[in-house]
Amino acid sequence: KLTDKVEFSQDSISFLQYGDAHIGMRAGEELTLEDSLYAVLLASANEVSYAVAESVGKQMGGDYNTFIEAMNEESDALGCTGSHWTNANGLHDEQHYTTAHDMALIGAAVYQKEAFRTIAQSLTHQIPPTNLVNEVRTVNQKHKMLWPQNANYYEYCKGGKTGYTDQARTTLVTMADNGELQLVAVVLYDFGSDAYTDTRAIFDYGFNNFSKVMLKDLEKADGVRSYKDEENAYVVLPPNVKFSDLKAEVKAKDGSVNEGTVTYTYEGQIVGKADVTLDNKKSVEKPTITKGTEKTGTTTDRKEKESRPVVLIAVVAVVLVLVTGAVAWIKYKQAKSRRHRRKRHRRKTSQKKKKP
């Protein structure tokens, strides 16, 4: 539960290095999991990421490394194919890596969690005094697309995660919802504010060129009797693509003869997926490929592993912190760059004044 306590061990504090983003937690302090996730997602607090991983790992019957294993297992289950996690903060490690595709899958999954949406959209949050520190800690949103007064503000933005390391450069994962489509944009190895410009361009293209088609308005694929949640079952069609161009794959869930999934693809890319009740008159024990007729189905599985929601929220939230460990470094670099530009401007101004 989000009210569970996260205790900070000495390990969670002592691993910090100079320049690592943190909120000044002490060994022996306790926060709720909810406040911890605010610190992770808004302030990129590295010691909190470690403590969350360690605490949830203990709840799973293990330790910090148990949580790291869970991160890898969860990303594999989501369909990630180019990721491997070795820590819970995103600081550079040759064996800690991901892809834009995988981050989009993770972003789409975590966006289904109400707790994540609430935290990720918050502009500021106050962490109350703890058992050891009698002061309020305030954490502020780093994602500029959420601040109305910022030049990078984007009205459809629903949250995300900023990141930076010297090796990965600027990275940004962003969720957006225009009332019809929900999209995730991922930019990696970008440069400063260009990440926001590039993210906006991705969203503009997505919202202007893709359309959502509801499954309930179309003919069901062979082997499908009904949809578990037809109000949220749909496919997203690329430009100039008809539903009849899609392929449908119907599979029975492990150990079930009545429940399954239908997955629609276009040229190998998944464009929709939905939980279904199977038509037992049709054989679907093995995957059956059928040509789409007039229908589409999609929704991220919103009921995934409800028996361990805290683990999923914590895993994906920390995964979204992939490259946020050195926030202090980017501030330093930006400040240094501004000083350099001011000096260069003064030199140019001085040279102009010296001209006859």
Model-found features: residue ranges?
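Active-site-adjacent loops and short helices of periplasmic peptidoglycan-processing enzymes
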Residues: 1-101, 105, 110-114
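Domain-terminus/edge residues, biased toward the C-terminal soluble/receptor-binding domains
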Residues: 80-81, 95-97, 101-102, 107-316, ...
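Cytoplasmic C-terminal tails of single-pass
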Residues: 335-356
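Intrinsically disordered, low-complexity charged/polar segments
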Residues: 323-324
